Amino acid sequence: MYQLFRHGIFQMDAEKAHNFTIQCLKLAGNPLFQPILKSLIHAPKGFPKTVMGVNFPNPIGLAAGADKNGDAIDGFGALGFGFLELGTVTPVAQDGNAKPRQFRLIEAEGIINRNGFNNNGIDYLIENVKNARYKGVIGINIGKNKFTSLEQGKDDYIFCLNKAYNYAGYITVNISSPNTPDLRQLQYGDYFDDLLRSIKDRQAILANQYNKYVPIAVKIAPDLTESELVQIADTLVRHKMDGVIATNTTISRDTVTGMKNAEQQGGLSGKPLQHKSTEIIKRLHQELKGQIPIIGSGGIDGLQNAQEKIEAGAELLQVYSGLIYHGPKLVKELVKNIK
């Protein structure tokens, strides 16, 4: 059935297809229709897992970028995910980069996007989270507005942290999108140190205010040198971050040279990212020595490479591009088998 749906949406521009899918899932998540979707999916229960102090119904999640504004929480939830990471969301709404900005690399099962954090703003997202009936864990992925300078960047993250804290199972700090100018600079040196220090200080204040501890993860890029990775791992440990998501999209085109759309600017996700993200997980795991849990993301399209990420050191997994190419059966297969 999904193959038929995929054939239809693949006739559309990639972003239009994405928006159409979100609307379908929003409708499917409606209390009137959700039982129908659930009966079609027959989502297995999966294996509960406690990571970052949070109880996840199962270790399979939706990666950020799929439901940026939380418009289809209950629809995605009905597919069987143990957790959904919403966003990336910024303090105020922004349009993102010029269209077209999403491109399929069908033969490689990849996607290139240069969206640029297009979203309706944190307040819109929080309203959707408040109204959702989904029983799994909701993660909220936060970023900075394009017009905010690097020097002021931490203010945007603190603003979003304040808004999201009481409504999130965990929060992700996204400093690794390649589509906001200079954003990845926040992964390095004094910027990184200062950002994490500010975030941890604010987390302590909010934990006291709300009388609950909401863990904070950092999402990193796959395009890191060995020394950069070591430095990032050291900084994460030093600031006692609660989790790390490895990885975001890649700016490398090594795996797709010569393919249609490979020349497009932006971050590459899907199968071409598979090996690279797993290698980063493996190295990160060696550096972190079990002190900080890793959430693995990047190119998961089946049980084998999902298992590879677990063996490399990931405790939870996230999918997005694989869902586009393989449909809900991918989620079902992973939930049923990954512990």
From Swiss-Prot:
It is an enzyme of class 1 (oxidoreductase). Its cofactor is FMN. GO terms for cellular component: cytoplasm; plasma membrane. It holds the Pfam family DHO_dh. Its main location: membrane. Its EC number is 1.3.5.2. It catalyses: (S)-dihydroorotate + a quinone = orotate + a quinol. It is a peripheral membrane protein. One of its GO terms (molecular function) is dihydroorotate dehydrogenase activity. InterPro entries: Aldolase_TIM, DHO_dehydrogenase, Dihydroorotate_DH_1_2, Dihydroorotate_DH_2, Dihydroorotate_DH_cat, Dihydroorotate_DH_CS. FMN binds at A64, G65, A66, D67, K68, T88, N141, N174, K219, T247, G270, G299, Y320, S321. The active site is at S177. Binds 1 FMN per subunit. Keywords: Cell membrane, Flavoprotein, FMN, Membrane, Oxidoreductase, Pyrimidine biosynthesis. It is found in: Cell membrane. Monomer. Belongs to the dihydroorotate dehydrogenase family. Type 2 subfamily. PANTHER family: DIHYDROOROTATE DEHYDROGENASE (QUINONE), MITOCHONDRIAL, DIHYDROOROTATE DEHYDROGENASE (QUINONE), MITOCHONDRIAL-RELATED. Catalyzes the conversion of dihydroorotate to orotate with quinone as electron acceptor. This is Dihydroorotate dehydrogenase (quinone).
